[in-house]
């Protein structure tokens, strides 16, 4: 019998996550939930503590870590290739120019290299750090199998065809997700990452403008007028739109919750891609369910985040354990 994605009270548990793991590729089968139990038993605790410590001095780093995992996994899989520095690498692509959180990953790696040299991959660190960032903001704890190896290839040319731009249509987003083995449900659920984090004004200010008299003029009619006015005020013409940031979620920006979906119902999605989810029946119905049931969102997030974290993983000779996350060995 096929599993139903939504029910009145979904009960996705550790067992369902394990079942999902077993159904995926043979490479994934080489991962395990206790991969470092013998070789580096404190690995996950070190990741968690370092993330918490970094966020105490810079709370914005949590949203940055979550965004970072999307930009890694969607471009040739969760292999840590987005972390590599250098001309022509993924990290050098303009589409990744605003990424952050790299220093936290390097801090974790430096500590682990002291206690467990050459053991824990940067790919695993990145996935665990994103998982812990969500937990630190009140989100669900996602069981993550580890044992990923680090990729040796990082090419800027691979970035643009694989990441979603803020003006994409639902069809374009579905096509990219489908190419990664992710469903429409995964698209809507993982878009919930926008319940935290912030965005630069130039990523959404094409949705409105001021007329010659200084009055607001909506270019995107799907945007709530009062919310658009708030965005205009925060993205004043006197400020640099490439450096000025606005919270993705205007209501509960420091909490991982289902407020993002409630915002969409009120036509207060920051990006065109957010608002687009309300314009298509395939996605709108899922938004409505998640907006009304945070438990359902957390259950769905656990499943979809796990699926994303298993995309294109490297194991064995397919990769390496980098000594530094910013460079191949």
From Swiss-Prot:
GO terms for cellular component: extracellular region. Pfam families: peroxidase. It is an enzyme of class 1 (oxidoreductase). Keywords: Calcium, Disulfide bond, Glycoprotein, Heme, Hydrogen peroxide, Iron, Metal-binding, Oxidoreductase, Peroxidase, Secreted, Signal. Ca(2+) 1 binds at residues 72, 75, 77, 79, 81. Substrate binds at residue 164. It catalyses: 2 a phenolic donor + H2O2 = 2 a phenolic radical donor + 2 H2O. Residues 1-29 form the signal peptide. GO terms for biological process: hydrogen peroxide catabolic process; response to oxidative stress. Ca(2+) 2 binds at residues 195, 249, 252, 257. Its cofactor is heme b; Ca(2+). Disulfide bonds join 40-116, 73-78, 122-325, 201-235. Heme b binds at residue 194. It comes from the Eukaryota. The active site is at residue 71. Its EC number is 1.11.1.7. It is found in: Secreted. The record marks 67 as: Transition state stabilizer. SUPFAM superfamilies: Heme-dependent peroxidases. InterPro entries: Haem_peroxidase (IPR002016), Haem_peroxidase_sf (IPR010255), Peroxidase_pln (IPR000823), Peroxidases_heam-ligand_BS (IPR019793), Secretory_peroxidase (IPR033905). Binds 1 heme b (iron(II)-protoporphyrin IX) group per subunit. Binds 2 calcium ions per subunit. Removal of H(2)O(2), oxidation of toxic reductants, biosynthesis and degradation of lignin, suberization, auxin catabolism, response to environmental stresses such as wounding, pathogen attack and oxidative stress. These functions might be dependent on each isozyme/isoform in each plant tissue. Belongs to the peroxidase family. Classical plant (class III) peroxidase subfamily. There are 73 peroxidase genes in A.thaliana. This is Peroxidase 18. It comes from Arabidopsis thaliana. The lineage of its organism: Eukaryota, Viridiplantae, Streptophyta, Embryophyta, Tracheophyta.
